[in-house]
């Protein structure tokens, strides 16, 4: 039946039988959605060809190239060009970009420029960088790094080259990072310095968690110290908001498991947990606290299996007695299988004995040294309160670790010597920036007994790397 007869039938008496539906078996498909340039996508039976006979995959690649060209040539009227700043030297490598020391040409202010790596991005501005910008704008706190502005640099090369449009996060410049500071044997820290920096660390982490944000890459290299002695959490490239369930009700959300640099990764992540919470950051804070005394990462594994073995060797065997929920972890069976189990049994917790010999300090003289600035390490009483805090921060069972709020209010911070407002007196004794020490001399590469390094996150995979350079490292506990 033709369309003309069909429409004519609509005007006939309603008592007549309605016309049959038109036969659509061989009807022409409606036109597909147009791509840029007015051409249409192929039908499912078109064998990968567009109506004009061109290859569809090539067509899509061309359109993506057009999109990238538009992105590279775009102007951003509400952000300044990075030429406002003069780059001086490279001072670090973050999770998702390089970091440069720079000077504002207009004001002379020294800043840090964090370049957002765009070489492997095919869909414009990376979502991880958008997250970082949004969170830093939200997190205004003395112990969290400051975001000043976002700048851009126009593309200087052809589309598809590495010189495409680039963006920079302009941050307040800090004089040192904690990894570089701890790697320099000439820098001596007193108990009050350690206590002050740990107070700052817990305060910043508590602000993060109260704002419903997970850092997910706690390590000494991501802790900065300003020239006036204020410690600041930095590098939010892996951070993300989290959902806090009311009274534990409702399903627990799933997050990506491949987060946190290996040496600071807690046992639940190593066992495949994807329903983790703030306690993964608390474990990292515990690793950093121990590092204040050991001056090197305390558990240096080169694989996830070796890292679990080192945790068991230092903190005791992982089993249902110390962590009832461990057998429910996704990788429990795989990691505990013989003959090369990553979860050795019969291991005792030796962390207290290893640390108590390092945590011995004189009590400060209340008359000549009321703030404990000149407290020295030697054979006197162990700081039991510090040891207790470290013990619970590094609890195998995440439910037995304190929250960052509880850790910030731990009794250790209220015992003499109490934390100071800052560690500027320590900063005044350090002539050169420890970023230069870290980047220029390879402080991370010189940490530990075996001339290895704190691993850097894998830039292309956008997650912490498990890879340790072959031949440079052997698994070790401090």
Swiss-Prot record:
Single Gene Ontology MF annotation: ATP binding
InterPro entries: CDK, Kinase-like_dom_sf, Prot_kinase_dom, Protein_kinase_ATP_BS, Ser/Thr_kinase_AS
Name of the top EC class for this enzyme: transferase
Signal peptide limits: none
Disordered, as annotated region: 1-55, 444-478
Principal location: nucleus
Residues holding ATP: 91-99, 114
Catalytic activity: L-seryl-[protein] + ATP = O-phospho-L-seryl-[protein] + ADP + H(+); L-threonyl-[protein] + ATP = O-phospho-L-threonyl-[protein] + ADP + H(+); [DNA-directed RNA polymerase] + ATP = phospho-[DNA-directed RNA polymerase] + ADP + H(+)
Biased segments, Basic and acidic residues type: 22-32
Keywords: ATP-binding, Kinase, Nucleotide-binding, Nucleus, Serine/threonine-protein kinase, Transcription, Transcription regulation, Transferase
Catalytic residue positions: 217 (proton acceptor)
Annotated Protein kinase domain residues: 85-413
Family: Belongs to the protein kinase superfamily. CMGC Ser/Thr protein kinase family. CDC2/CDKX subfamily.
UniProt name for this protein: Probable cyclin-dependent kinase 9
Species of provenance: Caenorhabditis elegans
Encoding gene (name): cdk-9
